[in-house]
Swiss-Prot record:
Keyword DNA damage: yes
InterPro entries with a match to the protein in the record: ARFGAP/RecO (IPR037278), DNA_rep/recomb_RecO_N (IPR022572), NA-bd_OB-fold (IPR012340), RecO (IPR003717), RecO_C (IPR042242)
Function: Involved in DNA repair and RecF pathway recombination.
The species this protein was found in: Synechococcus sp. (strain WH7803)
GO cellular component: bacterial nucleoid
SUPFAM superfamilies linked to this entry: ArfGap/RecO-like zinc finger, Nucleic acid-binding proteins
GO biological process, one term: DNA recombination
Name recorded for this polypeptide: DNA repair protein RecO
Keywords for the protein's UniProt record, in alphabetical order: DNA damage, DNA recombination, DNA repair
Family matches, as Gene3D superfamilies: Nucleic acid-binding proteins, Recombination protein O, C-terminal domain
One Pfam family in the UniProt entry: RecO_C
Keyword Metal-binding (UniProt): no
Family per similarity comment: Belongs to the RecO family.
């Protein structure tokens, strides 16, 4: 049929549309973020009822003007296991919101879908082990935020002072040293008045390692950095997103509230 096309991508958000339909927000390598009507998806036993958030879908879509409609769908991968833990579910929702804020319709961001799926895979592995440390979930969502912001063109400027251009080289061991987080500008050397946050040398060094593929760990495999530091880096992400993105990423606050209250691990300082 004229106007039919196939789309593959990740369902970021699904909401009601009228009495029986759903509105699907899909992240695709081909078209960026696109909104699609899913007719009858809210009816019992609908063949399109599998259009749910955090699911990779293969879609047959009809219509190129206005709100296109899903004619058929096939589930390629479901991340429903994320719901086994509140922290992993909140983190996944934050990544979905961040992707919506970073990508426009008909303006795909190369590599963003792949990066989101990599981090969802990591979160789902955590969700399968209820006893796994909450700190790993927190660190994963912070690192994922750093990766997605960089891919979307809003990366944190981690290597140079936003005021002087001098290198941001943390002097490990000099605990009086500080750099300031200025959400509208970047990171600046020194403890500046009006800074949203200040980082000490070890906090900045940890932040500068996050663009790498893997989480920073000690030689024994334990995660680097105590929970208060990771919560501080999450707060940095929140204020950076508020200052630069066209829409809020509200689930980051849910992640913060959820993980602030989680029990500390055995090796975590109190």
């Amino acid at each position: 049929m004229s106007g039919d096309r196939r789309l593959q991508g990740l369902a970021l958000k699904v909401g009601p549309l009228g009495e029986h339909d759903r509105l699907l927000t899909l992240l695709s390598d081909d078209v960026g973020v696109v909104r699609l009507a899913v007719p009858g998806a809210r009816r019992p036993r609908s063949s399109l009822a599998a259009a749910v958030p955090l699911t990779c879908l293969d879609l047959q879509v009809v219509g190129r003007r206005g709100l296109a409609r899903v004619r058929q769908l096939r589930v390629l991968r479901s991340y429903s296991g994320l719901g086994q833990r509140l922290d992993t579910l909140a983190s996944a929702q934050a990544l979905a919101e961040l992707a919506i804020a970073l990508v426009s319709s008909d303006d795909p961001v190369p590599g963003l879908l792949e990066a989101v799926l990599i981090h969802l895979d990591r979160l789902e592995r955590l969700s399968r082990t209820p006893g796994e440390e909450a700190d790993l979930c927190l660190a994963n969502v912070v690192q994922a935020g750093v990766h997605l912001l960089a891919l979307g063109g809003y990366g944190l400027p981690l290597q140079a002072c936003c005021r002087s251009g001098a290198a941001l080289t943390p002097p490990i061991g000099q605990w009086e040293w500080r750099c300031s987080v200025l959400p509208e500008e970047g990171l600046a050397l020194g403890a500046l008045a009006g800074a949203r946050l200040q980082l000490n040398p070890s906090e900045l060094a940890l932040l500068q390692r996050l663009p790498r593929p893997d989480l920073p760990r000690r030689s024994n495999g334990e995660l680097l950095g105590p929970r208060p530091v990771w919560l501080k880096l999450l707060a940095l992400l929140e204020c950076w997103c508020r200052a630069h993105l066209p829409r809020p990423v509200r689930s980051l606050a849910m992640v913060r509230d959820c993980l602030s209250a989680a029990p500390l691990s055995d090796h975590e300082p109190t």
